[in-house]
């Protein structure tokens, strides 16, 4: 599952504002300078502090997140740069970088070295 698929799947699980806000936060992460570890911490904090009213929806949303987290974030060390860009939906951003500094920011987001 990619980050984009995760955001879409979360919206399909529940129509609660909190879940839509989480999906939006996940999408916005792609455009800022925070790395995958920060993403993990923020989403885990969300699930620890925000309750989705229906237990089944909460459980499914957390299972989706856990699957992505375990595969993409915890497995990031075994991925090539292209696999990281794909998993985190960052191909377009990486390809549109106009400077080395912008590229280094993307490398940092996915814990990669140029």
Placement of each model-derived feature along the sequence:
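C-terminal-biased regions
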Residues: 1-114
């Amino acid at each position: 599952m990619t980050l984009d698929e995760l955001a879409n799947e979360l919206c399909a699980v529940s129509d609660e504002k909190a879940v839509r806000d989480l999906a939006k936060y996940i999408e916005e992460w792609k455009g800022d300078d925070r790395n995958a570890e920060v993403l993990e911490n923020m989403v885990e904090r969300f699930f620890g502090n925000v309750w989705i009213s229906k237990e089944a929806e909460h459980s499914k949303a957390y299972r989706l997140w856990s699957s992505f987290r375990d595969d993409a974030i915890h497995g990031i060390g075994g991925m090539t740069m292209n696999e990281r860009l794909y998993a985190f939906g960052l191909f377009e951003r990486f390809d549109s970088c106009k400077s080395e500094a912008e590229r280094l920011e993307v490398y940092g987001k996915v814990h990669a070295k140029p």
